[in-house]
Structure formats: C-alpha cells, structure tokens
Amino acid sequence: MIYILSLLIFFLLVGPVVAQNEQDQVIFKAMQDELQRNKAELALPGMDKPFYLSFSLGRFRQFEVVGELGAITNSLELPWRGIGSSQLLLGDYNNTNDTRFVGQFMKVGMPAEADYDMIRRNFWLVSDAAYKMALREAAAKEAALKSNPQTPEEAQLPDLVKAEPITKIVESKVPYEIDIKKWENTIRELSAIFKNYKEIYNSSVGISGLDMEVYKQTSEDVTMKQPVTYANLFAQGYVTTEDGVRIGDALSILVARPQDMPSLEDLKKKVTAFAENLMKLRNAPVVEEFYSGPVLFEDGASSSIFVNNLLNQGGLFAYRKPIGQAGGRTLEGRIGRKIIDNRLTVKNYTSLDKYDGTPLLGAYEIDAEGVIPEKEMTLVDKGILRQMLNGRVPSLKTQHSTGSSRFVMTGSDIVYTTAPGTIHIQVDKGTKQDKMKKALIKAAKDEGLDYAYIVRSIAGPASRIYKVDVKDGSETQVRFGDVSAINLAKIKRVLDISSKENVSNYILNRQVLSSLIYPASVLIEDVEINKSEPKKEKEPVLKFPLQR
C-alpha cells in the first residue's frame, strides 16, 4: 500500500510528460527512489557522500539472420533484456574523483520487465560498488596530483560542468518491426546470388539489429528517455587472385529500423553489384610502378578522408588530458587557425532528420548527459577552426558542453562518448561533378604525366583504384595500390572540390550512429600510390566446392 501510494504521488508530481505508460512510470519511480536514498545515506564513516549520482537503464532486444549460398546458418531473435549502469562522483564540480575524464561507469544487470523492487536492488548493489571504487580513485587522484602538478590554467578548470534540471521523454516515432520469417526468406534469396560467382568463397549475407530504450535519472534532476535503434544488412565474400593473394570485401546498408531497408529487388541489385565488383577486382591488373601526382578521391574514398581527419580521435572533439598522463593528439590548439581548405565549412546538426530525401540516423533531441544541443553548430568556418564538440567535462579551449555526449550502441553496457550528430561539409564555389575528372586530367598533364588515378574506396587490398589515361580519359581498374595517407596538411589546400553532395549513415568507431553530408569528390595533389606487396597464401588442397 505504501509503494502504491508513493507511486501515485510520483505520477502527480512528474505528470504525463515523464510517464507515458505504466512501464515508464515504474522504472522512473524505482530509479528516483533509490537514487535519493543513495545520495542521502551512501557514506562510510568519516568519508564523503557522493555529490553526483546517475542511473541509466536500457531495455533492449536484438535479432540476427545470416545465410550462405541460399541456406540459413543462423537465425536468432532475442527477447527483451535489461542492462544498467551507475555513474558516481565524489567531491564537487571543481574537483571530482575522475582522473581520466572519459566517464566513470559501472554496469549491472537489470530485469527485462519493469520490476520496481528488482530495479532498486540492482542499483543499490552497483552504487555500493561504485562508491567504494570512487573512494579509491579519489585517493589515487590526490597522490597523482602531488607528483604531477597541474599548470595554473589546468588547476582552475572545473572537472564537470553543471547540468540544468530537465525532463525529456523521446519516444520512437515508428515501431521497430522484427519479422524473422520475412528476413529468413530475404537472406536466402540474397545469399543465393553468390552461387552464380564460383570464384567467390566464404560468402555470407545477413541482417542484424538493436532496438533499445534508454532511461536516465540523475541527482541533478535530469529525467530522460530516448530510443537507440538500428538495423544493418551486410554481405561479404573472398576471392583469390591468380597469383595467390586473398582479397576480402564487405557491403553494409544501415537504416534505423528493419522495415526501412530497400525493397528485395533493390537489395538483389546491390548484392549483385557487390559480387561483380569483387570479381572485377580479382581480375584487375596490378599497380606496376610508383606514382606521385594528382589523385581524384570519389564517393567512399572522399568520405574516408574527412572522417579520418575530422571525426576520429584527435579530430573535432574536445580533449581533457588525464591526470598524470601525457596529452594526446588534439586540434584544440588550432582554434582560430586554418585547418582545411578555405572553401570548406563544417557544421554539426542534431535535430535534422532528413537531407535531400535521405533519412539522417545521427539526429537526436537530447544528449546522453541530459543537455539539449544547439540544432546547428559551425565547427569550421571557411577553413578556420571555430569550436569543438564536447560533453560536460571542460577542456582548456572548450569549457562548455555542446550536448555531444551520445549513447554507445551496445547491449552489454550503458555508456556514452563524445560524437557528432550529422556533420555537413559544405563547399563554397565547388566544381560540377562532371568536370572533376577533366580537372584531374588537366592537373596530370600540367605535371607531364601520362596517367593519373581515381580512388573510389579505401579498403586495403579491396580498395577501388582506377588508372586514367590522360589522352582519352579511359579508366582501367587496378589492384594492390598502396595510397599514401591523406592527413590534414593535404586537405589544407586542395586542387578542386565537387559541388555535388553525398549523404551516408554510419556507425562512428563502431559505437555511435552518425551521418555525414560530404563532397562527392575532392582532387588532391602530390599523392603517392605505390605497388603493395600483399601476402600470398597457399592454395587449399581441394578447391571450393562450387569450383570443382
């Protein structure tokens, strides 16, 4: 009776904005009650109480269907399960026990159902463990600061930016539909396509997905819920060249929900094109000599350049040096300086959910720390770095949160990392796409070259590289070309940039759903392509059964 009465009072206090259904009501009530108890009473004699505490709970289900040569090899639909995590900090906003500044999380199992008592019990268990770990970390941090004094600027920097109280419930706009029988039939048909390509072995086609709801309650009165969903259809296969080199490649189609996948006929076309490209690569001539000159990067190769330089570690993300450790690579010291070609402007969108007809999976309304991000942020303005993406841990150059903490897509833990929503690389006065190849040929002729290269994907031995004859513009696909790294210095000034834009969705660092709007091609000078020497493998004693 006491529990029912307290639950009713909770509903009246938080109102319909928080509680959308009975399940949500029970989960939030359990999290809030146990959080308040821990904040008030969790302390060992003579030790500090936590000043910050957050509980996160994820309810999720997963599925996977995999097939090979027309037969299903794995079909799995897991029921709803639960996982939780606790983040606990001692001290105050200026000085916490955190030494690494990447978030301190401790995970715990959770029931699949909204069981009030079980949820409270599990958060009680994990909070006790997190508190004891925080005490050890606080002592270790104190010792580390004595032996590794901070600069005056570092010492004045708070360890955490305060969050404003907020209640934000985000529900999936469309149900996540898992039709295992349908996907078994689809995967059978798609994987059977490889029966027509006897030189491709160890092929497979599959689809997997995650449907998750994340609940969060903090001691700062942040109450939030948001969905994290995706479905990924993949195909892979291997070929061996006549000289004994193994080449593997993969295809990936990423959407928010299984029902958002292209039609069966379109999927067949994509898998067939993938198989055809793998066969063309197998039979292509090898790169014969060293090349240094202009190279046109198109499509996936163009996106790789921007992702590798701007969106990986050391890119457009604020960085706080861990206590007692050497600093890592970061662009923060270049704020106010030119880092890329002045025709390029880089923006980050958070709420934009569609661009040029393509859904953007990087869209979100509230970040994983309860901060509402700006809908649009200019990170690089005409080549000049203006600001970085950041969470609530301030850095020397970025002392505020941009609302860029994103939940990591995994069913094994509830953690977050700094990541973009949708990055838009805008081009000022770009060149029409159909003129980019002409610009490549002209640049090659100006250097007295007989040929140049177009790179359409960068994937090791499976890279798609094309040799272009400057006389007639004809293209010949080649293989085993080792393309030199394209770093920021290379894109600080480029020869030409396409005005055409491509849109892609991807999982950044295999963690966070993100989207990228980028130039379809970029022409870069002084790129080296050399003949690589891939490892050769011995032929199997017996041939692949389809080759017999």
Regions found by a protein language model. Give the residues of each.
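Bacterial N-terminal signal peptides
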Residues: I4-G15
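Short non-domain terminal segments
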Residues: L8-I9, G103, S405
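Long, low-charge, small-residue-enriched segments that form tightly packed helices used
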Residues: S351, E369-R548
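Active-site bordering "gate/hinge" segments
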Residues: V18-D356, L361-I366, K382, F480, ...
